[in-house]
Amino acid sequence: MIIVGVLFFLLVYTWIIFPGVMLFAFRRDHPGRADLPCNEDTLPLTIVIFVHNEEGVLENSLSALTTCPAHLWNAEFIIILDASTDGSHAVVERFQALDKRFTLIQCDDRLGKPGQWHKHQDMLRARKGYLLSLDADVIIQSEGWRILHRLVQQNPEAIIAGRSRSQSNSTEVYFESESMYLSLETRLKLAEGDVFRRAMGVFGACYILPCKNLPVIPPNLTVDDFFIAYAQLKAGKPSIVSREIVAHEHVSGKLAVEFRRKRRITCGNWQNLLKLPKLPGRGSFQTLWLLWSHKILRWLTPILGIALIVSGCFLDTYLQPYGYFWSLTCIGFIILCLGAHYLGERLFHRSPKLLQGFSYFIIMNMAVLCGTFDFVLGRRHGIWKPTERMHNE
């Protein structure tokens, strides 16, 4: 009975209590964190974009880079082509001919973004000033450069990320559910950065940090953004998500695509967890508490949920048959909800939003469970194809 109570508490804690406490704290004012006065000094900036077959979005992104004001940023744009087979190379060369700030690095071997980080980390770490990592489809608006300049002056040692906002051309019903989850994640990371200056992970589409603070990135990494952000925290550097900088993240809304993405990310996060103790520095109590509350318990949710459901079969005999009834009721309820949602979509092309959200939650936790099994069994995921969910599907 005690074990059942502990399992139930952990699930309620990570999905209800912890977010509730953090969002409540986020609503409070923090007068001791007033904005510091800033100057207009020119700062060195290296912008790195890893590109694999992004011809459709690359021209707009590179055009936005040319608006970077020279009086604020002494900028250089490094575009690393990860074995692109489309016209991305020609797009970058065209910009390179018109603007000397562009540098093209072409790699024939397909390594993926983490692999390219590992290959070029020494060169990037040795540069002066700040390093801004952007996804190939992210567009920095003209006013964003001044905001970025102010933020790095106020937080010179921090890793600062833009907040994520999902968008998609897809009409799939699951886009809304994924957007709601991403919105909750964004608000939690905003709160963690605002209250503790320790946002658990950054959104990989847009973040900046001092070049010298780029950690040593190991080979065969699957998920790079969480590793880089946590390395900053362990080294005692702040991690912040800015409300003023918005990075639009493309999600497909297609169930199969999001399932594979969640599965791959979960496997990569468990791999990262084994590498974190080897990072230099010592994590504070607040950092470890946030890591456990926001990340690890989320990754353990499907295992905790299954254990809670089947625990009814192992209760003391004096509590039976209520324990069996509990287990069968939970299993039946999940099957009923998934079945009702499936039939609603097939027959009527719609289902209630609450039912849709619950079904999406269950299916995504199944993806997390598969990713956990992949990690335990030592399975390697293939290199992710970003174009699969960045273009119109």
Give, region by region, the residue ranges found by the protein language model:
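N-terminal membrane-anchoring/stem segments of glycan-assembly enzymes
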Residues: M1-N39
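Membrane-embedded multi-pass helical conduit in multi-pass membrane proteins
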Residues: R28-D29, N39, R298-R380
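Acidic helix N-cap motif at the loop->helix transition within catalytic regions
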Residues: V57-N60, D86-F95, W117, E143
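Short, acidic, metal-binding catalytic loop of nucleotide-sugar glycosyltransferases
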Residues: S63-N74
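A conserved acidic beta->alpha catalytic loop
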Residues: L81-A90, D109-L111, V138-I139
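Long helical/loop segments within the catalytic core of UDP-sugar-dependent glycosyltransferases
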Residues: Q106, K113-W117, K128, S142-L221, ...
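Short aromatic/hydrophobic "clamp" motif used to bind/position activated sugar donors
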Residues: L131
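Catalytic donor/gating beta->alpha subdomain of glycosyltransferases that bind UDP-sugars
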Residues: V152, P156-L184, N220-L221, I228-H294, ...
